[in-house]
Amino acid sequence: MFDGIGFMELLLIGVLGLVVLGPERLPVAVRSITSWIRAMKRMANSVKEELEQELKIEQLHADLKKAESKGLSNLSPELKESIEQLKQAAQSVNRPYQVQDPVKDTPAPENQIHSPVSSTVQTSQVHTSPAQASQANPTATVEASPTSASPATPSEPSQGADTRSNPKANG
């Protein structure tokens, strides 16, 4: 671990650490330094593993190119094995994700206490947007649509209008 550092150098570092940090803070400092070293080693190992994986993929890809150039009939067993591994990796990547069906996940109607409505009606109501609902039922109208509303302020006061707020009408 300490290739270039001998026993005397380690002893000198320990004494200097004891003098600078003191006996209370030295164990905490040693623990934090060792945790940093462990984290660095873990990071280096993960990078190393990723590089090895990438190199293996590159090797498999190169073997596949060789197999294509030679033809698939007269291949060595090593190339056939690498082709099979590559095919399996491609199939695992291309495998579609399985989506859970919300209808299958709902409890059976006899187990439901709060809702006498069937589960198909509930799911159709949940997954329908207002635009889709209006397209599905064109006869349905919205009560307060802005296009059919009358103007908010009348241009002329009506005969039964309240005259208390209008000073000209009072006088």
From Swiss-Prot:
User: Which HAMAP family does the UniProt entry name for this protein?
Assistant: TatB (MF_00237)
Subcellular localization is given as:
Cell inner membrane
Specify the protein name. Sec-independent protein translocase protein TatB
Q: Which GO terms describe its molecular function?
A: protein transmembrane transporter activity
Locate the region Disordered.
Answer: 69-171
List the membrane topology term(s): Single-pass membrane protein
The source's superkingdom equals Bacteria
Keywords assigned by UniProt? Cell inner membrane, Cell membrane, Membrane, Protein transport, Translocation, Transmembrane, Transmembrane helix, Transport
Q: What is its main location?
A: membrane
State the GO CC annotations: TAT protein transport complex
One of its GO biological process terms is:
protein transport by the Tat complex
Q: List the disulfide bonds.
A: none
Biological role: Part of the twin-arginine translocation (Tat) system that transports large folded proteins containing a characteristic twin-arginine motif in their signal peptide across membranes. Together with TatC, TatB is part of a receptor directly interacting with Tat signal peptides. TatB may form an oligomeric binding site that transiently accommodates folded Tat precursor proteins before their translocation.
Keyword check for Transmembrane helix, yes or no: yes
- Assigned protein family: Belongs to the TatB family.
Q: Where are the transmembrane segments?
A: 2-22
Organism name: Shewanella baltica (strain OS185)
What gene is behind this protein? Answer: tatB
